[in-house]
Amino acid sequence: MKKRLDYERSSGNVFVDIGFSSEEAEELGVKSRLIGAINETVRRRKLTQVEAAKICRTDQPTLSKILRGRVESVTIDRLAGYLTALGRTVEIRVTPYNARVKAGHLVTVA
């Protein structure tokens, strides 16, 4: 006899799925993608965390926490600053006003 698996359809945002508000989830999603870009850049440049931290003007323990996903104490602005220090260009684009949209969104494309 086959077991029936129960599942729940995803909202499309893992942070909403685990209970964060949509606003918190949006911010956490942006931070996650920026951290992913930082990790990728450090890896591609073959930097140690100590070297990367020096470039980003922070210390290795702080950078390590961030790279492991501890995002509560870091801002999107700081993450963008780390990326630019590492040689990446961070673009911020504001789209035109749309009266049909209740609220705008934070979106990252990395």
Short names for language-model regions:
Residues 30, 34, 59-63, 75-79:
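Amphipathic alpha-helical interface surfaces
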Residues 42-44:
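Short amphipathic helical patch at the helix-1/turn junction of helix-turn-helix
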Residues 76-93:
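DNA major-groove recognition helix of helix-turn-helix/homeodomain DNA-binding modules
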Residues 47-64:
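Short alpha-helical DNA-recognition segment
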Residues 1-36, 97-110:
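N-terminal flexible/basic segments that precede or flank functional cores
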Residues 67, 94:
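DNA major-groove recognition helix of helix-turn-helix
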